[in-house]
Amino acid sequence: MTGTEKTPAATPEFRLAYVPGATPAKWVRIWNERQPDVRLTLVPVEAAEVADVLRRGDADAGLVRLPVDRTYFSAISLYTETTVVVVPKDHVVAAVEEVTLADLADEIVQHPLDDVLEWESLPGQAAFERPARTADAVELVAAGVGLLVVPQSLARLHHRRDLTYRTVTDAPESSVALAWPEERTTDQVEDFIGIVRGRTVNSSR
């Protein structure tokens, strides 16, 4: 290298963490249209780990499930999900459009360790052992061992042809939000906030 040559500058990057079930594709597409010179990198992370990922600076912002620590994070609620019960297609619940928690009282209901719903009291009858992950719970439901209550996006994420789901009208709901460390509100974070809030290119912050 001669004295006149310069080291190429690193490509600017915005890292967006997202939890299972969150769907960043629409906002990523808009980002790529508006910020072609800033690479958006998606960082998949479990719901229980996303706060630590953001605290460590391994991502600039994240699509998370509420609640978050509002003393450290800023957050913008994006949407609240319908809660559903996942059942085998031949289960009696599959014959109706929606159910209540009382309808599940006599059923075994799987409660995985990574459950993202906040329960005052768990529905149904407890399984002998809690599965570690939602994916494991879905496998158990498919094997005829109980039912599973989850946000609709997770039911879709773990879709199987032999399973279906129905709305649970009185179950806790899960809200998805954009969150980031308040002390690290960068210009790129502000730009992404504008995208999720539907601002146009010419809108002010």
Segments from the language model and where they lie:
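Short alpha-helix C-terminal cap/hinge motif
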Residues: 2-16, 20-44, 52
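Secondary-structure junction motif
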Residues: 24-26, 93, 97-130, 138, ...
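A late-sequence structural motif
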Residues: 26, 166-204
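Hydrophobic hinge/microswitch elements
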Residues: 46-58, 112-164
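Beta-alpha-beta core module
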Residues: 69-76, 81, 139-184
